Regions:
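Cytoplasmic-side transmembrane-helix entry/capping segments in multi-pass membrane proteins
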Residues: 11-12, 67-75, 123-135, 157, ...
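Loop-to-transmembrane alpha-helix entry segments
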Residues: 104, 120-140, 151-158, 211-212
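Transmembrane alpha-helices of multi-pass small-molecule transport proteins
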Residues: 31-83, 110-111, 166-171, 187-204
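Specific alpha-helical transmembrane segments that line the substrate/conduction pathway
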Residues: 36-47, 88-120, 164
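Specific transmembrane alpha-helical segments of multi-pass solute transporters/efflux pumps
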Residues: 17, 21-22, 50, 57-99, ...
């Protein structure tokens, strides 16, 4: 299997898993808010991935990490596993699912745009068309065809979802500069999300245990939708 085919397969796996986000976000926030749901999901992701990394013997590499490595990992963890999901879960709880879904998936367009500046990639005709069509699709949905005005039910929440999508795009571009073992750095990303969501949960919400109905969405989200999907994504 060539590298390009393997990369395409990994992307397809991620897309299939991330398609479950609206489902787990809805059922996982029956009584929990976005801070609480993110905390429990991050806890599951961190526990599962760290156990896997430890059993494989790869976790020992963190001993050789420099301060710069830890700082960069913390930044990426905040961008891609905390801010992105914090705003995304808020969106699915308080805004129209279709609007959230469309704005959420602006990150592939933003990845192309950011790569031009941060990775010095060339702007080809294909990339130009992709960016233009992508933004046209987003504008069409948000304006409902009336391009003179934006018609969304909760503009602030949708704007936050858009900010989260930008953070995930930035995370995706910057993560290409990380040369560490994927399962190790991903487990550390979710450690950052776990700590950050714990602080924000206590600051803006409150500690709460998930209900019995919320356990399975949290497990599914923590193990697959968030957890292992990131290993495929950053490869």
């Amino acid at each position: 299997v060539t590298g390009r085919v393997r990369g395409t397969l990994f992307v397809l796996i991620c897309v299939a898993l991330w398609a479950l986000i609206p489902v787990v976000a809805r059922f996982g926030q029956a009584s929990l808010d976005n801070h609480q749901f993110l905390f429990w999901s991050s806890l599951v992701s961190f526990a599962v991935l760290t156990l896997n990394a430890a059993l494989s013997g790869k976790m020992r590499e963190i001993v050789g990490y420099t301060r710069a490595d830890w700082g960069f990992i913390a930044l990426l963890g905040l961008l891609g596993t905390y801010v992105y999901y914090l705003f995304l879960y808020l969106g699915y709880a308080r805004a129209s699912g279709l609007e959230v879904l469309v704005v959420q998936y602006t990150w592939p367009i933003l990845i192309v745009a950011l790569s031009l500046f941060l990775l010095r990639e060339k702007l080809t005709l294909r990339k130009t068309v992709a960016i233009a069509l992508g933004f046209l699709g987003v504008v069409t949905v948000l304006t409902k065809g009336d391009y003179a005005r934006i018609d969304v039910g909760n503009p602030l929440v949708i704007a936050l979802v858009g900010a989260g999508a930008f953070c995930f795009a930035l995370f995706s571009v910057l993560s290409k500069k990380v040369d560490k073992t994927p399962i190790v750095v991903v487990s550390l990303y979710f450690l950052v999300a776990l700590l950050a969501s714990f602080v924000s949960m206590l600051s803006f919400s409150g500690f709460a245990l998930p209900s019995r109905q919320e356990v399975w969405p949290i497990l599914l989200n923590g193990v697959l939708v968030n957890g292992y999907s990131y290993i495929f994504w950053i490869r």
